[in-house]
């Protein structure tokens, strides 16, 4: 037993000594030199992970070192130079938009959001850079990028940054007045630039994809028209939170997919979607808190209206001509702040209506009044109606005898008509 105890204690002491040797090595994997913070990678090279903006002199050029504390710099890490949160933040513009960042030839990778919202105006990118992450150079005030002509993967045209392989716009610069024909994708966050009036930028007919957050939160649209006649998909939050503008946006018949919150909070002059007959779904909050000066007509192909799709929207600015949705999500039209202009067949194919879907909404059913109860016909295909789906102040129902809708109306105390008349009691005549 004594020998076993001694052997165990020996193992424990060896483990403690080993930890004592390892811990200092681990602590040395991060460091700081001047304004730069860095982390050592497994191959013994360094990744820049942070920058001390509190010690930065306004509009001074930033030279990223080739070597830092004796280690070769091969990477600029995620959000290493990023500032603030969210989308465009004008607090940083006047301090950095004349500054230039020179990336050394040792760097092979610039990670996602590396310079996001930093306000930096100019970049020099060497041929050595093989990988650029999402929104890496979306600074909010990008003036120009210069990419070495020998770079195999990336290019700069009129100051804007592009991926050669993906034929994608990665960052739009203020010098750019047109995107070259052949570009098929507008990258995430790529057009967020507070120095640009986007209506003065010509987008080619070759564009097929608008990725997430591509135009999110822009307040420099100006007045004019932007056409995306051949776009097939619009990503999540792609046009969300656009500020007050006089812009009109057109989409053509090729559009088949609209992302979540795609136009939520946007303020436009007009949005044209009437030709988009391949679109079958309005996803979550796609038009929540949306506003346009002219009425937006949606295609008749829509079969699914997602949750919060039009919540808190001035709904009279939309036309639902001949639309026959099958599924209406929870809170889809909640507190729409106007009269919902639908035709008499709007509910003719509906199968499911989510909770609070029409709370606070009222209908015209092709009548220009809403001070009387509108009679909504619920078909026998309807097998689910969520809690508080309708505001009883404005609605009464026509239902099929023995249907789910009739049972629901009875249980919830709604006024309804099932098309039958009660048989008169004649027993007293006997």
Question: Model segments located where?
Answer:
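Bacterial N-terminal signal peptides
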Residues: 11-20
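Structural signature of tandem-repeat unit edges
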Residues: 35, 39-45, 57-74, 86-109, ...
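Consensus positions within tandem repeat domains that build extended binding/scaffold surfaces
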Residues: 78-80, 112-114, 134-136, 188-189, ...
């Amino acid at each position: 037993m004594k020998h076993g105890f001694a052997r165990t204690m020996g193992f424990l002491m060896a483990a403690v000594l080993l930890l004592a040797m390892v811990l200092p090595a681990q602590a040395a994997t991060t460091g700081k030199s001047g304004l730069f913070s860095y982390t050592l990678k497994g191959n013994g090279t360094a990744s820049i992970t942070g920058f001390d903006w509190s010690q930065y002199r306004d509009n001074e050029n930033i030279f990223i070192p080739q070597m830092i504390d004796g280690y070769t710099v091969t990477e600029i890490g995620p959000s290493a130079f990023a500032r603030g949160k969210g989308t465009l933040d004008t607090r940083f513009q006047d301090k950095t938009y004349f500054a230039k960042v020179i990336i050394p030839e040792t760097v092979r990778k610039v990670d996602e959001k590396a310079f996001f919202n930093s306000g930096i105006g100019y970049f020099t990118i060497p041929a050595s850079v093989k990988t650029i992450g999402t929104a890496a150079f979306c600074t909010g005030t990008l003036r120009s990028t210069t990419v070495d002509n020998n770079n195999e993967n990336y290019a700069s045209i009129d100051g804007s940054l592009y991926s050669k392989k993906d034929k994608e716009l990665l960052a739009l610069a203020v010098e750019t007045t047109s995107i070259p024909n052949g570009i098929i994708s507008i990258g995430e966050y790529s057009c967020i630039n507070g120095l640009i009036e986007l209506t003065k930028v010509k987008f080619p007919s070759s564009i097929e994809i608008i990725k997430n957050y591509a135009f999110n939160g822009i307040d420099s649209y100006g007045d004019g028209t932007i056409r995306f006649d051949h776009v097939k998909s619009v990503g999540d939050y792609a046009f969300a939170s656009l500020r007050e503008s006089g812009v009109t946006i057109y989409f053509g018949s090729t559009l088949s997919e609209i992302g979540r919150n795609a136009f939520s909070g946007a303020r436009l002059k007009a949005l044209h979607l009437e030709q988009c007959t391949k679109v079958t779904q309005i996803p979550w909050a796609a038009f929540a808190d949306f506003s346009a000066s002219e009425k937006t007509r949606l295609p008749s192909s829509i079969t699914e209206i997602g949750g919060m799709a039009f919540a808190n929207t001035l709904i009279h600015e939309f036309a639902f001509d001949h639309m026959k949705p099958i599924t209406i999500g929870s809170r889809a039209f909640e507190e729409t702040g106007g009269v919902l202009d639908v035709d008499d067949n709007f509910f003719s194919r509906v199968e499911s209506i989510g909770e609070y879907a029409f709370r606070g909404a009222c209908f015209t059913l092709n009548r220009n009044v809403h001070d009387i109860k509108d009679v909504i016909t619920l078909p026998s295909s309807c097998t689910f109606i969520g809690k508080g789906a309708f505001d009883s102040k404005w609605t009464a129902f026509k239902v099929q005898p023995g249907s789910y809708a009739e049972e629901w109306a009875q249980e919830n105390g709604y006024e309804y008509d099932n098309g039958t008349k009660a048989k008169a009691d004649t027993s007293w005549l006997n």
